């Protein structure tokens, strides 16, 4: 059996896509809480938006009948997990799993956005 050509392909950064019921409300949340900036939007009215901060990117898609999942939508790394946790707590963000050191070498917590999308945030320790 010959090796698959997949082994010669290098993968880069992945950008998660999130369904949201109100794309403008989601934009306000991600910009105010996480400091993300809108770098692209499409549609009239807007139905798709790309948000970015540093190397992190989130793609939002309008879906009025979105039902939140019970699993994490994605994981992202930050360089000051304690500061982000404090920002989330002060803003009244719904914390799903509180901040703690994990046995897999990360300090992490999970929060939910206004649409119930669960975001896992970690920092390597």
Predicted regions and their residues:
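N-terminal beta-strand motif that seeds the catalytic metal site of vicinal oxygen chelate
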Residues: 1-25, 72-74, 122-125
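Core segments of cupin and vicinal oxygen chelate
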Residues: 11, 17-57
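Vicinal oxygen chelate
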Residues: 13-21, 49-52, 63-91, 107-112
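Conserved active-site tyrosine of GNAT-family acetyltransferases
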Residues: 26, 30-31, 88, 113-116
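A beta-strand edge to alpha-helix "cap/lid" segment located at domain peripheries
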Residues: 39, 78, 90, 115, ...
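Short loop/turn motifs at secondary-structure junctions and domain boundaries
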Residues: 41-42, 100-103
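Short, ordered coil/turn segments that flank beta-strands lining enzyme active or ligand-binding pockets
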Residues: 56, 103, 114
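Short beta->alpha transition motifs characteristic of CBS
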Residues: 61, 103, 110, 121-125
């Amino acid at each position: 059996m010959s090796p698959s050509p997949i082994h010669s392909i290098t993968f880069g950064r992945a950008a998660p896509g999130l369904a949201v019921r109100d794309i403008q409300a989601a934009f306000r949340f991600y910009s105010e809480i996480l400091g993300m900036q809108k770098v692209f939007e499409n549609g009239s009215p807007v139905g798709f938006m790309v948000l970015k901060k540093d190397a992190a990117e989130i793609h939002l898609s309008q879906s009025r009948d979105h039902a939140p999942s019970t699993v994490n939508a994605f994981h992202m790394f930050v360089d000051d997990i304690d500061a982000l946790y404090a920002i989330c707590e002060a803003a009244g963000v719904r914390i799903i799993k509180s901040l703690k050191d994990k046995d897999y070498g990360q300090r992490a917590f999970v929060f939910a956005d206004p649409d119930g999308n669960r975001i896992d945030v970690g920092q390597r320790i």
